Curated annotation (Swiss-Prot):
It catalyses: 1-(5-phospho-beta-D-ribosyl)-5-[(5-phospho-beta-D-ribosylamino)methylideneamino]imidazole-4-carboxamide = 5-[(5-phospho-1-deoxy-D-ribulos-1-ylimino)methylamino]-1-(5-phospho-beta-D-ribosyl)imidazole-4-carboxamide. Its main location: cytoplasm. This is 1-(5-phosphoribosyl)-5-[(5-phosphoribosylamino)methylideneamino] imidazole-4-carboxamide isomerase. Pfam families: His_biosynth. Belongs to the HisA/HisF family. It comes from the Archaea. It is found in: Cytoplasm. Its EC number is 5.3.1.16. Transmembrane segments: none annotated.
Length: 238
């Protein structure tokens, strides 16, 4: 199981938000490219890069800054935030991203997943599913749909998604531990890799995800607040 450090960028700083709220931050640090490099030096085999400005504004911004982070990291990078079109996705793949992460746009228009995966290959297309109380959320967690993660996950899998990044919003950013059951439902019902995210605070949390068969876990706040040592986490997850 891969451990993927999160490098969330806002206003050219590295931040960790509480429950996705731009006004509530656990962490705010300068120089995201250097932070990305630090995680790689500690053993990260992949990085999770999120352009929060792009996610909030609904369009690509800070392209050059993101390119620098991708280019200098030395490991595969999955990038999300503000990717709303086929051309946005292709842009980041051409700039060296290993995977692009689609959010609301893929849930509202699943055909875009098929279009992108037919060009770059499904292994390069990840769709982010965020859920609260068993229902998928869209538009930055501001709207709740009537559908479960498994229902939407199956549609996205059929459309050519190569993996699902699943965030249990009930746990995200609170540093209170995890509930693996919603993630396990996806692992049990889909045939593509599931990347788990949200609420990890201990190596024991990571082992719970490993037990249910997730492909990777994105870890953010717990790394930045020194609740988890990255080297220990990687060792435990092998």
């Amino acid at each position: 199981m891969l451990i993927i450090p999160a490098v969330d960028m806002k206003n050219k700083k590295c931040v960790q938000l509480i429950q996705g709220n731009p006004d509530k931050k656990h962490v705010e640090l300068d120089n995201p490219p250097e932070i990305a490099k630090k995680w790689v030096e500690q053993g990260a085999e992949m990085l999770h890069l999120v352009n929060l400005d792009g996610a909030i504004n609904g369009k690509r911004v800070n392209d050059e800054f993101i390119e620098e982070t991708i280019k200098n990291s030395g490991v595969p990078v999955q990038i999300g935030g503000g990717i709303r079109s086929v051309s946005d996705a292709l842009y980041f793949i051409e700039k060296g991203a290993e995977k692009v992460i689609l959010g609301t746009v893929a849930i509202q228009n699943p055909k875009i997943v098929r279009e992108i995966s037919s060009i770059v290959g499904k292994e390069k297309v990840t769709v982010a599913l965020d859920a609260k109380d068993g229902k998928v959320l869209i538009k930055g967690w501001t709207e709740k749909t009537d559908y479960s993660p498994v229902q939407i996950g199956k549609i996205l899998e059929n459309m050519g998604a190569g993996s699902i990044l699943f965030t249990n919003v009930d746990s995200e950013g609170l540093l209170e531990g995890i509930n693996v059951l919603p993630t396990k439902e996806l692992v049990d019902n889909l045939n593509i890799p599931i990347i788990a995210s949200g609420g990890v605070t201990t190596v024991e949390d990571l082992l719970k995800f490993k037990e249910i068969g997730v492909y990777a876990v994105v870890v953010g706040s717990a790394l930045y607040k020194d609740m988890i040592n990255l080297k220990d986490a990687i060792l435990a997850s092998k």
